[in-house]
């Protein structure tokens, strides 16, 4: 039985605290669309996506209106294109991306993820073709997102793939230089990538997933901040008390997301997959993960104590969300994307949040270095080395880590770049020691998996 206070609290979340469902993502398997004839493949892909996604946007809007809770983004994820399009070379992979972009546009969704390669132990012909196609594919499409998994705790890190991704990111930035390298904002490099992520740009549908499935990503950093503020005003509070407040709030936010996701799935006649518990910020006041750090007594995100606060936040979100849903998946934690969070972007601009501190914080957060803008002249080997560092954190700690980094052509440290929309804007962050990693990266090979990978 809900108390009057809980009902009023939920209404406040909707009216004043930016509570929303950040994304409902429809996963569609394309394995049955595979063909060595490109035209046949393209027709099958368009037909299947159209068949299942035709009513996705309208259904999300109807369900959101019914409950008074907006579904901000409607998205599609597909099977890894490097596998589905294994017979194709780079040119046909570019064409495949354009087919997917058209299908996403026809369905009315914001983004389509799954232009993906899984290369943690090595690269097939299809994997290499997809990666080689990325600069042109991401430059000539608007809604296609890509991810490349280069490591895992069981397999180690494919350093040849890491080096290749450093080169590829530089090429993508150059190919989209007229748009401040925005193509790089649609590419994520992972270690331990989950198979059911609803958030972009890392979403794809894994090989063990259903033919079609709904996954939902909740939001709510503003809700968490307001709950902490109320708790701090009511008397002396310890960090244990604050963690309890976060946990209870995450429960409410997750339950809302699951209700929306399950009803959308039921109306579309497809199974419900998972709720991703991640606190996903937006570039507006009151919807910031960074503001939570100030609510618990820090001057800003990035100052000493930030990693500890993030660890507590991440853990409390998982505990509360797991109690609210029997099917939790995806990334599930707290995102700290620099340009997508006004408060974090401000901390980066003032120098309180550095690249090194950001990397330290990724060891305890949901993902990794996210939406980080760096100088356009940063060498490819340095970018690869940044990726390698982040992948090592994920491999050793048996967690998902990722890098979405944007070398902005023509910009230097301290300049400002605006990507627009949910991608926000940010100062260009300096890269200490840039140019000092060339020999290390060119060694290549596979970095062995840690000893704790031997679990059988």
Curated annotation (Swiss-Prot):
Subunit architecture: Homodimer.
Membership in a protein family: Belongs to the UPF0210 family.
Gene3D superfamilies membership: 3.20.70.20
NCBIfam families in the cross-refs: PRK05313.1
Name of the molecule in the record: UPF0210 protein Dde_3704
Pfam families named in the record: DUF711 (PF05167)
Species whose genome carries this gene: Oleidesulfovibrio alaskensis (strain ATCC BAA-1058 / DSM 17464 / G20)
Top-level taxon in the UniProt lineage: Bacteria
